[in-house]
Amino acid sequence: MSKRNHWYDYLWVLTALYLALGFFNILFAWLGLLCFFIPLIMASTFGTKSYCNKYCGRGQLFELIGNSWKLSPKRDIPSWIRSHTFRYGFLLFFTTMFVNMLVSTYLVFTHAIYFHKTVSLLWTFDVPWHWAYSGGAQPWVAQFAFGFYSIMLTSSILGIITLLLFKPRSWCVYCPMGTITQLICRWKHRK
């Protein structure tokens, strides 16, 4: 008997579309905030990780690439990556990068620094991305878009690297949003 597909089984299309749209117009990066707020709202409201388990388009995309395209060796992820130390350390690092992006956006808003049309891959490599922005928005709006897209693209690259080395959804083990929603769920159930 085959598995019945639901509408939410195709949310990976939105993730792929989001990543593709950022190549053509960086302002679409603002849509990525949905992937930030929806898991937080769902975890706070329901006290479950249902977003991660059922609705996360990125996890679905990694599953598609790893399983359907057979690009994953399906090895277990090392225990040190699953450890609380690594997960919370990675969350702290990711949060620091997010705050750095917000500070850069604020500095562009206050005209303290110039707006940069680059995407930072793996928080290290600034890649020119000028073709994806033709103007029309306040510089700080575009700066936030470049920064947020950098975070989303970097996390996608990390997810693809880990699916090529381990199981398809290995990224989910150390995903910062997954760690935050897990903390929210624990806090909610302790009340």
Annotate each predicted stretch with a short phrase.
Residues 1-191:
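Non-ligating segments of multi-cofactor redox enzymes
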